[in-house]
A protein has these predicted regions:
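Structural beta-sheet core signal
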Residues: 35, 80, 103, 135-137
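P-loop/Walker-type NTP enzyme "switch/lid" segment
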Residues: 2-13, 20, 24-96, 175-183
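Conserved Switch II/interswitch segment of TRAFAC-class P-loop GTPases
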Residues: 98-117, 141-143
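NTP-binding/hydrolysis catalytic cores, primarily Walker-type P-loop NTPases
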Residues: 181-205
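Beta-strand-loop-alpha "switch" segments that mediate conformational coupling across diverse proteins
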Residues: 141, 151-182
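Conserved C-terminal guanine-recognition region of P-loop GTPase G domains, centered on the G4
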Residues: 113-130, 138
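Hydrophobic anchor at the start of a short beta-strand
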Residues: 32-33, 78, 132-133, 161-162
Length: 205
């Protein structure tokens, strides 16, 4: 079983967007996928409720937010959307389950500083647990100074940058229908699929 955890201590950085897209990718590969939502806002769970029956199936993993247990048997791929403020013992408990951790980061100096200590803590715990960590830049406009600052910060961490995802209405419009870029005709989302390619390769590796 492959367990992917999406984590960042700050709210509003794109954790649910990334979680649902990753689940959608696994489902499009015809894996038995469960999406767990440990966040108080339950955005991923809401997204699942909007997902049409005609789309690749993704099952909801019902979680006790205070006690994250192992996923049910028969599942091949699990994606866990975690709450803001994740650290300490709770972070360690989550990482006991995880094979890979994906950290979304936005090109904002406030987000960067808020995430710095978390990445240091995460790297120490993950090294002991032999968990892989990857960073994804979210809502990035490559032409801006903020994007340059994000790139410089990420490079300084020594952690791998999987990709930079652009700021596009595609994610918002698809989320409103319970869908992902992997559920629609490729020609509609060519640029986005191109940005997802290195993430998908890392997830499959």
């Amino acid at each position: 079983m492959s367990v992917v955890v999406v984590a960042n201590p700050k709210g509003g950085v794109g954790k649910s967007t990334l979680s649902t897209q990753i689940a959608g990718y696994f489902a499009s590969r015809q894996h038995a996928v469960m999406l767990g939502d440990a966040d108080r806002q339950q955005s991923s769970k809401l997204w699942l409720s909007l997902r049409p029956a005609s789309a690749w199936p993704i099952t909801s993993w019902e979680l006790d937010r205070d006690d994250i247990a192992k996923p049910p048997k028969g599942t091949t791929h699990v994606v866990l959307d975690t709450p803001a403020g994740l650290h300490g013992k709770r972070l360690k408990d989550v990482l006991k389950l995880a094979h890979k951790v994906v950290v979304p980061l936005q090109p904002s100096v406030f987000d960067i500083f808020a995430t710095q200590d978390f990445l240091n803590e995460l790297a120490q715990i993950a090294q002991a647990a032999k968990t892989q960590i990857g960073i994804v830049g979210m809502r990035v406009d490559e032409r801006t100074r903020a994007a340059e600052q994000l790139r410089a910060f990420v490079e300084s961490t020594g952690l791998p940058v999987l990709s930079y995802l652009r700021n596009t209405q595609n994610y918002i419009q698809l989320a409103a229908r319970g869908l992902t870029v992997f559920d629609v005709a490729p020609e509609r989302v060519v640029r986005d699929l191109g940005q997802w390619q290195p993430i998908c390769e890392w997830l499959d590796n």
